[in-house]
Amino acid sequence: MRRKDFIFENIKEIENMLNKIEFGVMAMPDKIPYAVPISFCYKDNEIYFHGAMAGRKHEILKNNPEVSFTASKVYSYIPSSFLNNTMIPTQFFFSVFIEGKFEVIEDLSKKRKVLYELVKKYEPENINMSMDKGQFKGSEIRTFV
């Protein structure tokens, strides 16, 4: 980061923000970089997401698991009218940037737990959600996490 005074290292607050931010963007190396927005959850110092076991993202990750991930939240918009119309408009963001390696979770029990955490993040009121009912039944087998 260019501005050292903007670096934020409070791990608890970073974790708190990751649990609130609605989506992130994962970038993968391809002939040209490929970046996709993903729903995610943060648990135990790791980023989790799920996806189909087909398509461009899956193929790229299968061939090269090196990824970067960012999630952001706008803090403040600074309009051009600020300081007597002497500014180019800008924004302040809270953002997290992570580089790492993608890994598929093969253990079905852990995969089910992660899928449950993903649903819980986006539907906290869904206290009756079960991985053994309806559309969720067997879904951990057909997806990568």
Q: Where is each model-derived feature located?
A:
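An N-terminal domain-cap segment
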Residues: 1-44, 48
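Charged, gly/pro-rich active-site loop segments
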Residues: 2-5, 76-145
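Short, intrinsically disordered, mixed-charge
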Residues: 19, 62-67, 116-124
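A generic structural signal for short beta-strands and their flanking turns/coil linkers
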Residues: 22, 36, 45, 63-67, ...
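Short glycine- and Lys/Arg-enriched binding-loop motifs that mark or flank ligand-binding interfaces
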Residues: 27, 51, 96
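Short, structured patches in soluble enzyme cores that scaffold and shape functional sites
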Residues: 28-30, 71-73, 102
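Short, well-ordered alpha-helical microsegments
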Residues: 35, 57-58, 129
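A short mixed-secondary-structure module that forms the rim of ligand-binding clefts
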Residues: 41-78
